[in-house]
Amino acid sequence: MERGIPTPQTNPYTQSRMTKPPIRVLVAKPGLDGHDRGAKIIARALRDAGMEVIYTGLRQTPEMIASAAVQEDVDVIGLSILSGAHNTICPQLMTLLKEKGMDDVTVLVGGIIPGADIPSLKQAGIAEIFLPGTSTQDIVEFINKKHAA
């Protein structure tokens, strides 16, 4: 062995022992709703759990969210929707993601979503809906399980 060249036996941080890159999550507030406290709390919890978080800010269109997802090469998109526009925004976003070849991205929705709307959102491709009162730990665990490997 040449001196100074690390091997798996001499350097515990070689590629074979490194962890995979962090899960990349885009957190967005679509629509006209200006209440972003919940989205910021989720973004911080995900970051604290070791995920890489990109927060897009308020008043994002589905087009803006899809473009940001492509640019940032994210694994997960989290939407915070309190305005009642979920039945319009979510299907539009899912269509745009598919058109951009990003239909493997996990899309989550949090906010005030009537129970009657949940089946159609899941049918549109939303992976999970988190209602008010869901713990941040439950969201972190869902994402970690979905992206374990």
What role is predicted for each listed range?
Residues 145-149:
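The C-terminal output helix
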Residues 39-144:
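Cofactor-cradling patches in redox/metallo enzymes
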Residues 3-4:
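Intrinsic, low-complexity polybasic segments
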